[in-house]
């Protein structure tokens, strides 16, 4: 399992973490610049969840960068247990937030036609932020599965 792509302290792990953090930051940036997002609970939850995702992923990206630079091994069972719990929690929260935001976007666009009735509503930005959140979740879920797989191999 030492050669598994995406393990902590490897270039693959660093790329996964940086991708998670960048997509979460993009989601926060797009949603935060959207007019009226704070009026909808699902969008506020998305911002909070992506904030947590960004902090967790950025912290672990820094740890991966240090481990690569110092040639350290981050695959001890204690560290992997911490990574598994953190990754699963952030992945589940990110998926819930992304799904709820997607539900509101679909409601606005297809069901009640808010986007047509209220052209000042930035539905395109809501949709783009939700897409960024799903991309961040996909990378987070990938990391969570890799960490679980590594922990199970011990």
Curated annotation (Swiss-Prot):
Q: How does it sit in the membrane?
A: Multi-pass membrane protein
Keywords, in A-Z order: Cell membrane, Membrane, Transmembrane, Transmembrane helix
InterPro entries on file: CASP_dom, CASPL-5
Record topological domains on the Extracellular side = 39-42, 108-130
Transmembrane region(s): 18-38, 43-63, 88-107, 131-151
Q: How does it assemble?
A: Homodimer and heterodimers.
Task: Tell me the protein's name.
Answer: CASP-like protein 5B2
């Amino acid at each position: 399992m030492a050669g598994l792509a995406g393990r902590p302290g490897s270039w693959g792990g660093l790329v996964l973490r940086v991708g998670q953090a960048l997509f979460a930051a993009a989601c926060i940036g797009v949603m935060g610049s959207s007019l009226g997002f704070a009026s909808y609970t699902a969008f506020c939850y998305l911002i909070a969840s992506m904030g947590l995702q960004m902090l967790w992923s950025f912290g672990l990206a820094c740890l991966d960068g240090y481990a690569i630079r110092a040639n350290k091994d981050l695959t001890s069972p204690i560290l992997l247990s911490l990574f598994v719990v953190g990754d699963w929690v952030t992945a589940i929260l990110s998926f819930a937030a992304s799904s709820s935001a997607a539900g509101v976007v679909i409601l606005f666009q297809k069901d009640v036609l808010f986007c047509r009735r209220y052209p000042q509503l930035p539905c395109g930005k809501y949709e783009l932020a939700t897409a960024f959140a799903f991309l961040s979740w996909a990378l987070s879920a990938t990391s969570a599965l890799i960490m679980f797989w590594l922990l199970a191999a011990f």
